[in-house]
């Protein structure tokens, strides 16, 4: 048997999925082209983008044109000043003070015209691009989700589903940032650079060429750093995707994580990927700032060279060179260099977006072999259900050399019920998957009514098939909607009828909200039996021509199993039904039983015929004692089996049900009324990184002083030409030129320091916040997870989006703001020193800018909150669909999920359109009023100079300083929306971190007894689930369990069996009464110690995306478990031989949720994991239900051996598995109806007797 198990298991795993190795996307310099990123723009988007670019280029020309006006004003003012102070020397000069006033007024009007252009085109460039970015991003989100849903199942076998969900949030957000308002700002700067360059060349090509001599160095350094940024960004995003995958896996399996005390292990897995992201992020930040610093260094060197050479030209007698010419060239070059520097952060955002787009577009461009949305193929008028497998051979795409099916030939007549049986790995599941056309055969064909299914329309064909799987999948909506997912356009009467046929109607109607009752995430609010019956109703409502049942009744309790089995048998009439069975007792009445082995049919016939042959089927049947079952069934009376007088064993209202309307409203209020978070509180988040933040802030402040100091040098340069001899002028030119070079060195060093210190601080903060948030999530109690707002999709979105918004605001954005504040403060101070009157006039425009900033900040904060909620809801829908893709595909409900996803995105899309206009208006006003302020300043400055109250030197210093200060204000306002988003994200993060769980799993308080014997007692326990306080689950239940005894809980679905187990694990605390362990209330015990004494094997085993050895070692997370010990428990669980037959043995990766393994293999790993824990209390919830016939007895024996000397609680539906229990407890209405041994209860002839008879 061991050899057979090893061979079959190896086939089931290797043949199906190939070598079990992790699918890790390769990382490199991967980014889409700068044009390709806009591939989802439609004609309107192209028009908007074109107009936006044109507007940004015109807007970019405003400052270079201003330099021309500045040059003219400079000549006029200098000449006017010379006329006024040297009247004797200039007595024959034609220029008079009146003429000067007229010229200044005309030039001021030019300034006002430039400001008006900036107002109009500034609004157009920003609003149009934000609009088109919102439109394209929404389209990309839809197309990305559509492409995922369109992929065939083989693609999902090789993809990390959790990473896909991370890309749907984090990567697309980065893409949106990169194609939004940063693009027109980049084009504005490019335009400013180009036009400034042209102006400088026209005014003085010699001087311009000297300045441009540094351009190759600038371009080379920028190109090198850009390549580094692309590569590092790709690595960073990849690491975050892997971290998101770990988080999603842990959060979606929180009960397993909590039960095994594995929170710290999951945190370590998560943190390891965060460390990789942090290392790449630090390098990326450093490279980005180094690039910016190099630009400023080379440009300042060019300025120094320009001034030195300019003075040489003037005093060398070159015609046409005046102070105005030099200033026009100089300011054009200055602005061009400023534009080059300003391009860098926007280019970085765009570069990051291109890297993110590569991953997104790669999925979008993937063409599936079987397109789930395809309209191709013919649609037959009707389907009878005649099925034939003609010489079908198949191997899974991931391992084409390993054949799973080898020339399978099988005919199934319409209306027949055919059962597929055989050991694990024989190809049963593969056969039904091929029939659903989840895969296509390599050789041969499958026909339905003599038509190759590949020639039929895939959606129409799948709509003719109903599937009920062993592990039912429900979606996080109402019971009614879950049933209606079975078929499009289902009416209320059809839904109710399907529920009746599935024996689900009564318990549904017992809920206060009936069919409108929410089932919770993954059906968490329903018991296993309730979930299965809803899934059966969903299949029946399809009215399928072909019905596939994969152990469809395995999760049902004893009372309803026979009723549902009867309903299924009735539903099978007139339909072709294929049953994949482990429990042969459920398929004795099949028209045809097909026994498979090694991908081929070895025998077929009726039950009686195959038993008579005494072949493989006979061996399987004998392993289950089916003969004994036959004899028992013959001795039972039909009246007992059919008697429904005993009714329901419990009020279904006691099932774990969703929250009431009032509670939902309270939860909604709580979510939408989060406290306001101040910027100071956000900054305090980075206090752990204070040395880096302080050094980075000092570097930013020093960097911010570069421009104000430059304004002083500039003013001195103007006065340098007033009545000075050549020798003095040459000395001054050399001095100021060297000072400009020094300023360039300061800029280089300070930018590099910002990258080093802020980069480290930002990535450390991001890692710490993600770590803290993930830890806070993992240590919440189960009641917190019952809240529908805390679903997996919403929580992973919080980790991916909120932290990203906070991290920059508290560190690198702080550096930019500090730099701008330093620039602005010093500029204003210098301006007051050199011309307080002119400064006051210009600053009178500041309130307009301040009000504009406040309006923008307030509006952005509101939009950020609404966007977050909308994206959370969208993330939940996407996560649910992708995680349960087989169910979605089988139900052909891809379009339904796509529609729900698109509807959710509409809120965010509408917000983006409103935000576009507000952002555009605020930017345009702030940008235009700078020009208006300049116009007023120059006119007033000319007046002050004429009045003798100010010198040209002071006016130019004030003008330059205020100009740089205004640019700093504008740059600060650009980042205002980022702070609004950060405040919104921080409010949610703080709420999470402050939420203290009622049951603190990480608490060190509580007793830790030296020994645990295992005596249990439920003393007058009453319990209601916190989210539904009006529905009692347990009512004054009292029960004593002696150490070492095996006690089984039986009863119908929802009567409190699982609740008892959860209370014992202290997932919840009773409302009244006590749960005692060795006479001590479990509330008094240390919760970690308590859970370390228990181990659970659930009906639906949860495995993690790591190796087999790591999954088994998950049973004991307090130590490093030796491999030998792992092998021992694997052998005890009858899984060791199978593992040893795998190429990588215990290092084999099991895939996401154990997808690389069969159900039986997963269950045996879960049993091994529980055995490793060496618990004093063993909790078994139908632990052998997923096992095939061949190994069920062996594993049951292993469990019988494992529970010796342990207190064992068994939650049972199949009564045959608990007949040897020391005590059987029958629950009804949340209390004990009767208890005793199997024989005692049979003699009583009460409820248990009737259950056995019905079974």
From Swiss-Prot:
SUPFAM superfamilies named in the record: ABC transporter transmembrane region, P-loop containing nucleoside triphosphate hydrolases
InterPro entries: AAA+_ATPase, ABC1_TM_dom, ABC1_TM_sf, ABC_transporter-like_ATP-bd, ABC_transporter-like_CS, P-loop_NTPase, Type_1_exporter
Recorded topology in the membrane: Multi-pass membrane protein
Catalyzed reaction equations: daunorubicin(in) + ATP + H2O = daunorubicin(out) + ADP + phosphate + H(+)
Tissue expression from the record: In developing eye, expressed in basal limbal epithelium but not in central cornea. Acts as a marker of limbal stem cells.
Localization annotation: Cell membrane
One GO term describing the cellular component: plasma membrane
CDD domains: ABC_6TM_Pgp_ABCB1_D1_like, ABC_6TM_Pgp_ABCB1_D2_like, ABC_MTABC3_MDL1_MDL2
Glycosites: 86, 92, 189, 372, 391, 643, 790, 1036, 1105, 1189, 1229
Sequence intervals crossing the membrane: 46-66, 104-124, 290-310, 314-334, 694-714, 738-758, 814-836, 841-863, 955-975
Gene coding for it: Abcb5
Protein's UniProt name: ATP-binding cassette sub-family B member 5
GO molecular function: ABC-type xenobiotic transporter activity; ATP binding; ATP hydrolysis activity; efflux transmembrane transporter activity
GO biological process: cell differentiation; eye development; regulation of membrane potential
Every ABC transporter domain range: 387-623, 1016-1254
């Amino acid at each position: 048997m061991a050899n057979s198990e090893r061979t079959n298991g190896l086939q089931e795993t290797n043949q199906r999925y190939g070598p079990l190795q992790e699918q890790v996307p390769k990382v490199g310099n991967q980014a889409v082209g700068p044009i390709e990123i806009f591939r989802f723009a439609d004609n309107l988007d192209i028009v908007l983008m074109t107009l936006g670019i044109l507007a940004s280029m015109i807007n970019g020309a405003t400052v270079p044109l201003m330099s021309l006006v500045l040059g003219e004003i400079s000549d006029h003012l200098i000449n006017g000043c010379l006329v006024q102070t040297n009247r004797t020397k200039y007595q024959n000069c034609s220029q008079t003070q009146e003429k000067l006033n007229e010229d200044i007024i005309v030039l001021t009007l030019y300034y006002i015209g430039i400001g008006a252009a900036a107002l109009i085109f500034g609004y157009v460039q920003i609003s149009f691009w934000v609009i088109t970015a919102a439109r394209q991003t929404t389209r990309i989100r839809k197309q990305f989700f559509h492409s995922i849903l369109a992929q065939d199942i083989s693609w999902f076998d090789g993809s990390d589903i959790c990473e896909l969900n991370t890309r749907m949030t984090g990567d697309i957000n980065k893409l949106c940032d990169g194609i939004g308002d940063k693009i027109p700002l980049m084009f504005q700067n490019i335009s400013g650079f180009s036009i400034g360059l042209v102006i400088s060349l026209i005014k003085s090509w010699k001087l311009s060429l000297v300045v441009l001599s540094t351009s190759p160095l600038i371009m080379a350094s920028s190109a090198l750093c850009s390549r580094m940024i692309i590569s590092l960004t790709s690595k960073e995003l990849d690491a975050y995707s892997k971290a998101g995958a770990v988080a999603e896996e842990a959060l979606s399996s929180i009960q397993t994580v909590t039960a095994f005390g594995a929170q710290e292990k999951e945190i370590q897995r998560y943190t390891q990927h965060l460390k990789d992201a942090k290392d790449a992020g630090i390098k990326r930040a450093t490279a980005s700032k180094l690039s910016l610093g190099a630009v400023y260094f080379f440009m300042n060197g060019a300025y120094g060279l320009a001034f030195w050479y300019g003075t040489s030209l003037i005093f060398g007698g070159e015609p046409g060179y005046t102070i105005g010419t030099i200033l026009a060239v100089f300011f054009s070059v200055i602005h061009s260099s400023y534009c080059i520097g300003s391009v860098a952060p926007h280019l970085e955002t765009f570069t990051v977006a291109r890297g993110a787009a590569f991953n997104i577009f790669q999925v979008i461009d993937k063409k599936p072999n079987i397109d789930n949305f395809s309209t191709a193929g013919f649609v037959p008028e009707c389907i009878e259900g005649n099925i034939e497998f003609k010489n079908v051979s198949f191997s899974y795409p991931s391992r084409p050399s390993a054949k799973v099916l080898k020339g399978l030939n099988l005919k199934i007549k319409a209306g027949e019920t055919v059962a597929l049986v055989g050991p694990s790995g024989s190809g049963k599941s593969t056969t039904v998957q091929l029939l659903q056309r989840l895969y296509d055969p390599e050789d041969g064909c499958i026909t339905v009514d003599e038509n190759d299914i590949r020639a039929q329309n895939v959606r129409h064909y799948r709509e003719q098939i109903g599937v009920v799987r062993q592990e039912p999948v429900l979606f996080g909506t109402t019971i009614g909607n879950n049933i209606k997912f079975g078929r499009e356009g289902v009416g209320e009467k059809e839904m109710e009828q399907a529920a009746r046929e599935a024996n689900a109607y009564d318990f549904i109607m017992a809920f206060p909200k009936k069919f409108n009752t929410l089932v919770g995430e993954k059906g968490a609010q329903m018991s296993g039996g309730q979930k299965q019956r809803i899934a059966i109703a969903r299949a029946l409502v399809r009215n399928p021509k072909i019905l596939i049942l994969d152990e469809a009744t395995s999760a049902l309790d004893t009372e309803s199993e026979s009723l549902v089995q009867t309903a299924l048998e009735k539903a099978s009439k007139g339909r072709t039904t294929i049953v994949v069975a482990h429990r042969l007792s459920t398929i004795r009445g099949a028209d045809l039983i097909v026994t498979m082995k090694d991908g081929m049919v070895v025998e077929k016939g009726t039950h009686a015929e195959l038993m008579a042959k005494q072949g493989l089927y006979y061996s399987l049947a004998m392993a289950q004692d089916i003969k004994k079952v036959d004899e028992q069934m013959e001795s039972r009376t039909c009246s007992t089996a059919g008697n429904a007088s005993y009714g329901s064993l419990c009020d279904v209202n006691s099932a774990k049900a969703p929250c009431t309307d009032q509670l939902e409203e309270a939860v909604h209020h709580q979510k939408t009324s989060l406290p306001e978070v101040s910027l100071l509180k956000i900054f305090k988040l980075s206090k752990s990184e204070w040395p880096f933040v302080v050094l980075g802030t000092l570097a930013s402040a020093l960097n911010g002083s570069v421009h104000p100091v430059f304004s002083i040098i500039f003013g001195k340069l103007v006065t340098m030409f007033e009545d000075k001899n050549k020798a003095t002028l040459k000395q001054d030119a050399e001095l100021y030129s060297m000072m400009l070079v020094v300023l360039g060195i300061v800029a280089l060093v300070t930018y590099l320091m910002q990258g080093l210190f802020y980069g480290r601080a930002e990535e450390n903060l991001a890692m710490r916040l993600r770590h803290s948030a993930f830890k806070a999530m993992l240590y919440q109690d189960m009641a917190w997870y019952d809240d529908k707002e805390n679903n997996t999709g919403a929580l992973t979105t919080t980790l991916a989006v909120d932290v990203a918004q906070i991290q920059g605001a508290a560190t690198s954005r702080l550096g930019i703001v500090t730099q701008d504040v330093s620039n602005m403060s010093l500029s204003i101070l210098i301006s007051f020193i050199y011309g307080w009157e002119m400064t006051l006039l210009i600053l009178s425009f500041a309130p307009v800018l301040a009000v504009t900033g406040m309006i923008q900040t307030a509006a952005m904060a509101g939009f950020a909150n609404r966007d977050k909620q909308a994206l959370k809801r969208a993330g939940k829908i996407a996560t649910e669909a992708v995680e349960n893709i087989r169910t979605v595909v089988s139900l052909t409900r891809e379009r339904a999920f796509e529609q729900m996803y698109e509807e959710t995105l509409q809120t965010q899309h509408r917000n983006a359109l409103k935000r576009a206009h507000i952002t555009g208006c605020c930017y345009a006003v702030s940008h235009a009023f700078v020009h208006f302020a300049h116009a007023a300043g120059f006119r007033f400055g000319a007046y002050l100079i004429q009045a003798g109250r100010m010198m040209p030197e002071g006016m130019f210093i004030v003008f330059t300083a205020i100009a740089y200060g205004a640019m700093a204000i504008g740059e600060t306002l650009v980042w205002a929306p980022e702070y609004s988003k950060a405040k919104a994200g921080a409010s949610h993060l703080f709420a999470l971190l402050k939420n203290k769980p009622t049951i603190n799993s990480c608490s060190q308080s509580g007793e830790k007894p030296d020994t645990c014997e295992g005596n249990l007692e439920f003393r007058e326990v009453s319990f209601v689930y916190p989210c539904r306080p009006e529905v009692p689950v347990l009512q004054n239940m009292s029960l004593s369990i002696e150490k070492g005894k095996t006690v089984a809980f039986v009863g119908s679905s929802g009567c409190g069996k699982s609740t008892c187990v959860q209370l014992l694990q202290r997932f919840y605390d009773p409302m009244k009464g006590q749960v005692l362990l060795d006479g001590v209330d479990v509330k008094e015990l240390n919760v970690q110690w308590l859970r370390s004494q228990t181990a659970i094997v659930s009906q639906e085993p949860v495995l993690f995306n790591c190796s087999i050895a790591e999954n088994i070692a998950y049973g004991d997370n307090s130590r490093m478990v030796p491999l030998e010990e792992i092998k021992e428990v694997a052998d005890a669980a009858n899984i060791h031989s199978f593992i040893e037959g795998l190429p990588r043995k215990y290092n084999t990766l099991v895939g996401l949720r154990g997808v690389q393994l069969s159900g039986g293999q997963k269950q045996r790993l879960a049993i091994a994991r529980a055995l490793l824990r060496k618990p004093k209390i063993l909790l078994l919830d139908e632990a052998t239900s997923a096992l095939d016939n061949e190994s069920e007895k062996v594993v049951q024996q292993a469990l019988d051996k494992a529970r010796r000397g342990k207190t064992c609680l068994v939650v049972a539906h199949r009564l045959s598995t608990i007949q040897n229990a020391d005590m059987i407890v029958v629950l009804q209405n949340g209390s004990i109806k009767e208890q005793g041994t199997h024989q005692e209860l049979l003699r009583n002839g009460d409820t248990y007797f009737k259950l056995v008879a019905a079974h």
